[in-house]
């Protein structure tokens, strides 16, 4: 029977193959130039773009999850993997080409997620060309919490019809106590092989008041231009309003 399930003392594994057949008559307006991505979260939607796509199509995919159990009860999702593809009866030039849904076979889209128990998660999203040779979209994001230290990392690479973005950003925060927090973040642009910015901030929070000091150094692609330095003082009254004062150099 489906979905297929396998249980052990500590884990429950579930594999769910998915199939959907749809047909929408009529004619849709031309969206071919729209900036429209396609990922796994859109796979089974009736309208994968801003409108319902006309024509006959089929969706084939699967979901696989590993759930952690305690006392024979599922307490959290440890790992998940999802994969799928759209098959169209014929090409539709009115659908955004960036989405690959205008082709007879769309990109193979997927998502993987792993839960590191108490410290955080890592997510991987991708879009593989239907020829299975070209990786058109590649995104990795992770958030880890080690108590007083928090770390995050994001990596994005776009190729071919999806785009040209290629960068990595990371940040680290040090929580001295419940009131004081120091954070640092940076972003690297691999297209230009340059660092785009640095952010250094200090934040003090107590009750409904949050005050902070932020230093930002932003670099330009033109090497003849000096980096832009900004020092900003922020104060927020939760949940009312915030005041920002910036000093540029």
Enumerate the predicted regions with their spans:
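Outer-membrane beta-barrel translocator/pore domains, especially the C-terminal barrels
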Residues: 1-249
